[in-house]
Amino acid sequence: MKLSRILLTLTILLTPFVYSKDLTFASPEEAGMSSDRLSRIKPAMQRFIDEGKTIGIQTIIARNGKIVHFEHLGKLNLETGAKIKSDSLFRIYSMTKPIVTTAAMILFEEGALLLDDPVEKYLPEFKDKKVLIDGALVDATHPFTIRELMSHTAGLTYGIFGNSPIDQQYRRAMFGENHVFNFENVAANGSSSRIKTLEDLVTAIGPIPLQYQPGTQWVYSLSVDILGAIIEKISNKTLDV
């Protein structure tokens, strides 16, 4: 896939985050782009709606701090019939991962962090971690790093996709002692998690042992959330818009 297509795909998916008050509108030509080519986007997106592949789409393209294309088609909600508007909000789930990782790499380019920095340097809640192996707690071979957060190899887990002793501790920390997690219930009613901020998350799972030695396994985890907490700490800004 060409880089331009990848960037366009990300632009479509990440609309709520790139549409910032810091951007201004301009003609495509002012930003070195083609009005003719950009005009092909709307009918292409409309076809997805007409073919029943999605109920609505919002697209935005910006270059050099100027928005040159911003359109919304279709509905936001089938049940209510609400249409997508310029300020509609979207739940994008794991598409926050490229946003968070990009923000971290910007800080890396600015010299604010190093990929092999230990996470405990920024979040002392993760200092002197233990690892639960065969029911016994052992010392971690090394403090897990920002690089390992980015690659899901830090020793963390997610808490809701498995039932290991560490997963169970995550669930108790995030949802309470007797909570039974259910994806359908979350989709219908929202999460009942007691975690409201990234700082809450760090405080909750910081004391919990690692599930495996850092750098030895790939396990889908809350590592990108922890990366977000580091970004907040370094930048002194909240991660959300």
Which role does the model predict for each range below?
Residues 1-7:
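Bacterial N-terminal signal peptides that target proteins for export
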Residues 7-16:
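Bacterial N-terminal signal peptides
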Residues 18-20, 26:
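Boundary at the C-terminal end of the N-terminal hydrophobic targeting segment
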Residues 25-92, 112-114, 128-136:
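Short, conserved catalytic-motif segment at the N-terminal edge
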Residues 39-46, 65-67, 88-119, 224-235:
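Active-site SXXK
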Residues 71, 120-121, 164-211, 238-241:
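Short, charged, amphipathic alpha-helices and their helix-cap/turn boundaries
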Residues 84-88, 184-187, 206-214, 223-226:
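Flexible glycine/proline-enriched surface loops and loop-helix/loop-strand junctions
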Residues 91-95, 109-165, 207-209, 219-222, ...:
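Active-site helix/loop module of the DD-peptidase/beta-lactamase fold
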